[in-house]
Curated annotation (Swiss-Prot):
Topological category with respect to the lipid bilayer: Multi-pass membrane protein
Species, as recorded: Thermosynechococcus vestitus (strain NIES-2133 / IAM M-273 / BP-1)
Protein name: NAD(P)H-quinone oxidoreductase chain 4 2
Catalyzed reactions: a plastoquinone + NADH + (n+1) H(+)(in) = a plastoquinol + NAD(+) + n H(+)(out); a plastoquinone + NADPH + (n+1) H(+)(in) = a plastoquinol + NADP(+) + n H(+)(out)
Annotated TM spans: 5-25, 33-53, 86-106, 114-134, 135-155, 168-188, 208-228, 242-262, 276-296, 310-330, 331-351, 384-404, 416-436, 462-482
Enzyme class: translocase
Record-stated family: Belongs to the complex I subunit 4 family.
Keyword Transmembrane helix attached: yes
Pfam families, alphabetized: Proton_antipo_M (PF00361)
Disulfide bond entries: none
């Protein structure tokens, strides 16, 4: 569906353009600036919801609201934007999390103009990543997003903020180069040079080039997801970032990695994905178990939540590797669910830090007595994270497991092994989450912490937490609230990828027959095809 008015351009540029007016605003201890930033974020979020309600057709798997304007025609670079079922729910998630993160940053005193400028610039970059349809445009916006995050951590972070910010920029910047290298390799192949991402997905590449490009994209997006062993920047970044920045980092930026895997690795390189899908599943299992076990040993509250994020993002890899619509649907739902859950947990971790001035769990022990409402909200959020039935985490993880169970691309033995190992991580999750709640809120009271009265969560903070918990419960009770926005698209992508299975099976029948459940059927199909020639 083409829309005459360039709504996507407006949505992408509005926060950034508005940010440039911040230096001329009257400032009284940052009050004017913070209200201005919140108003822009609310306007952007509301406008996004209105535009997609009116112009987005969830029953179509095609790109919609397409906008293409020549930018640098000499090199084929266009300002090209469009959305589909992958982009729309993630843009809406971006709007909710960023708006609440700006509202959460109400007490920023140090350089408030710069802080809110960077938050709005980061908001624009996230929208641009999900809407970009030109390879170079995607890469430029992806790189632009790194700068605000680096500054937000290095200026407003904790004691080790410079180390954490530098580690973040090194990992992500180096990883991003693989997007450019792999993408340009695809663009220059053949006689028809194109930077349009949809056109790149329609080319027929040699298998070697497709596998190399897939590996490059996997490294780039694996850093952002993150995938073990490319994850080590994340605990440091979360451990030092302020709570609002952690909300955006966990709630949206990690999802950019999952989005990239689906958009580039699945949609553009389906043949290579058949080869790499078992690798993604293995990496997903490692993420789930490693993240859960490592989280259990963390004494820093935010570092424990960071490793929890690594574990939960492993389910995204399982869903992507399942090679069917159910699994891919579950991967998308897990990204949306984790975005909400991680945002509220990191926000509440910030609430406790503002009162106790520590992230060491043994020093916060027993604060439920002074902060009962915070305790209740943190417990509810932890229940969502450990996949309590009735909350979004349960539905998303269950959908991923169903996707694996129903996949005809793997043998029963392989599927049972994967599900068993992933279930180990699921079992460990409530252990480290409930232990965290007990140690922070209900453990033995730390004497120095109770020499002063701790103020409980205030109405503004309660509103922020409930604004994230309500959709978590809504999706858990009625998943169609979320899935209806993307299930047609994920089903179409999964069908497209699954169509590459027979070709891969034909060229690798001995190995394929050992690993996959559908090999006998595909063997008959390929044999009949060969005999008919």
């Amino acid at each position: 569906m083409n829309v005459q008015f360039p709504w996507l351009t407006v949505l992408t540029l509005l926060p950034l353009v508005a940010a440039f007016f911040i230096p001329v605003l009257p400032d009284r201890e940052g009050k004017t600036v913070r209200w201005y930033a919140l108003a822009i974020a609310l306007l952007e979020f509301g406008l996004s919801a209105m535009v997609f309600w009116r112009h987005y057709d969830a029953q179509s798997a095609q790109f919609q609201m397409v906008e293409t304007v020549p930018w640098l025609p000499q090199i084929g670079l266009n300002w090209s934007l469009a959305v589909d079922g992958l982009a729309v729910p993630l843009i809406l998630l971006t709007g909710l999390v960023n708006t609440l993160a700006i509202f959460a940053a109400w007490q920023v005193k140090q350089k408030p103009r710069l802080f809110y400028f960077l938050m709005l610039a980061l908001y624009s970059a996230q929208i641009g990543v999900f809407a970009a349809q030109d390879l170079i445009l995607f890469f430029l916006i992806w790189e632009l997003e790194l700068v605000p995050v680096y500054l937000l951590i290095s200026i407003w972070g904790g004691a080790q903020r410079q180390y954490a910010a530098t580690k973040f920029i090194l990992y992500t910047a180096v990883g991003s180069l693989f997007i450019l290298i792999a993408g340009l390799g695809m663009a220059f192949y053949g006689g028809d040079f194109s930077l349009n991402m949809a056109a790149l997905g329609l080319k027929n590449y040699p298998l070697a080039l497709e596998l190399l490009a897939y590996a490059g994209f996997l490294i780039a997006f694996g850093v952002k997801l993150p995938i073990f062993p490319l994850h080590t920047w994340l605990p440091d970044a979360h451990g030092e970032a302020s709570a609002p920045v952690s909300m955006v980092l966990a709630g949206v930026l990690l999802k950019m990695g999952g989005y990239g895997l689906i958009r580039f690795n699945l949609q553009m390189l389906p043949d290579a994905h058949i080869y790499f899908a078992p690798v993604l599943i293995a990496l997903g299992v490692v993420n789930i178990i490693y993240g859960a076990l490592t989280a259990f040993g963390q004494e820093n509250l935010k570092r424990r939540l960071a490793y929890s994020s690594i574990s939960h993002m492993g389910f995204v890899l399982l869903g992507i590797g399942a090679l069917n619509g159910i699994g891919l649907n579950g991967a998308m739902l897990q990204m949306l669910s984790h975005g909400l859950i991680a945002a509220v947990l990191f926000f509440l971790a910030g609430v406790t830090y503002d009162r106790t001035h520590t992230l060491a769990m043994e020093k916060m022990s027993g604060i439920a007595q002074s902060m009962p409402k915070t305790f209740a909200l943190f417990t509810a959020s932890s229940m969502a994270s450990l996949a309590l039935p009735g909350m979004s985490g349960f539905v998303s993880e269950l959908t991923v497991f169903l996707g694996l169970t129903n996949s005809d691309a793997y043998s029963t033995t392989f599927k049972v092994g994967v599900i068993f190992l992933a279930a180990v991580g699921v079992i460990i999750t409530p252990v480290y989450l409930l232990s965290m709640v007990r140690r922070v809120f209900t453990g033995k009271q730390a004497g120095d912490m109770f020499d002063k009265l701790l103020l409980d969560i205030n109405p503004r903070e309660t509103f922020i937490a409930l604004s994230l918990l309500v959709p978590i419960i809504a999706v858990g009770m009625y998943p169609k609230v979320a899935t209806q926005t993307y299930d047609v698209t994920t089903t179409a992508i999964a069908r497209h990828v699954h169509g590459a299975l027979p070709a891969v099976a034909q060229h690798h029948l001995p190995l394929y027959a050992q690993l996959t459940q559908s090999a006998p059927r595909l063997f008959r199909e390929t044999t009949v095809a060969d005999n008919s020639l």
